[in-house]
Amino acid sequence: MSFPKVIVVSTGSELTAGRSQDTNSSWIANELFGMGFTVSKFVVLPDDPVVILEELRTLTELSMRETSILLVMTGGLGPTEDDYTLEAVCRLKGVTTEESPVARQRIETFYKLRGRNFQEAMQTAIRQVFVPKGSIILNNSVGIAPGFITSLAENVHLGCMPGVPGEMTEMFREELAPWILKTYSSRELYSGFRFIWWMSESQFQKEFISKEKAIADGKAIWGVAAKRGYIRASFQSDSRALVDDLLRKLDTFYGTKSTPDIFEELPRMLLEKKITIGTAESCTGGLIAKTFTDVPGSSAYFYGGIISYDNSVKTGILGVKRNTLDEFGAVSRETAKEMAEGALDALGVDYSISVTGIAGPGGGTPQKKVGLVYFGIGQKNEETEIHEHYFPFPRSSFREFAAHTGIYLLYDRLKRSA
């Protein structure tokens, strides 16, 4: 089948009301991008059967102008009365439903293990086991509700998955993605990315993208996503050599500010080199430690973190001198240095990260403004490095900028020490 126009549809009144973010669509688009497919449109719909039906009908009518259309839809397959996707698809196709035997068995097992009578939940939970008649069933290895693939017209295919992110991601990778690759003639595309630290999207476009002839000529597609403390710059082309060349140019142009995904690379480095680390955090309140311990297996290298929010913890546990606090203040190079060195001793680790700053909105002075932050990167038997940064952002954003920067600074020191 020819290369399709791809449209991603998300349903949920919590999305259209702004109470939740649609993370599913961006995740799906990124996966499809890596498979060689580019999303041309995103659609977000409320839990309204009329709206869902009309939008699917409108999208299907695009088939008269397109060679092939692939709709990837999430949400509306659960047990509650506001789950309307199945109903809308069946009405559009003029078909009834049929039961997924696998889903039926999973839901019966689910209730039996919890000591509940399956019949008591029949009126609501049973809704999850049905798909449009004649569909290809997408099994749910995480939850209960199956997804399905069905045709809405000769050249329009619809793949529906649950809206729960954990269920959706597994179903996409295990069930839907293999079907897409088998069904459509995808272009063989190559992609790559880098994190560029302390960089804005507009600055990146001005000083790098605008000067690349291959991008101007349409030989490569580029994308950029702003994160807290860095941007993620990506390239895609049917030429592997061109993608590799763009990445090399990035590394040359930005130097140590250009990195791979350090949140994946740093744990690998720590495990490989058998390095242990710990943290001493003030203004980030343990966010750096959380980021490390979110990774499975982090106990092999992360020994612990000390949240020294109050000065008494800085002096009592980390050994920061009272004279240092009195003379230079809690937010200072000197305090960051003693915090990092105190963490090395208190936790018995090879490397440490310390951070102390003014998250705001109060606490700033003309000499030390809100957003000022100091980092210490300690290394056993080596000189502690101190770094000063300024992140004049709201409190939550400041904390993320600071946490990500602290992790980057450790990564950078390890790379230089290799």
UniProtKB/Swiss-Prot annotation:
SMART domains: MoCF_biosynth. It holds the Pfam family MoCF_biosynth. Disulfide bonds: none annotated. NCBIfam families: PncC_domain. PANTHER family: NICOTINAMIDE-NUCLEOTIDE AMIDOHYDROLASE PNCC, NMN AMIDOHYDROLASE-LIKE PROTEIN YFAY. Belongs to the CinA family. This is CinA-like protein. It comes from Leptospira borgpetersenii serovar Hardjo-bovis (strain L550).
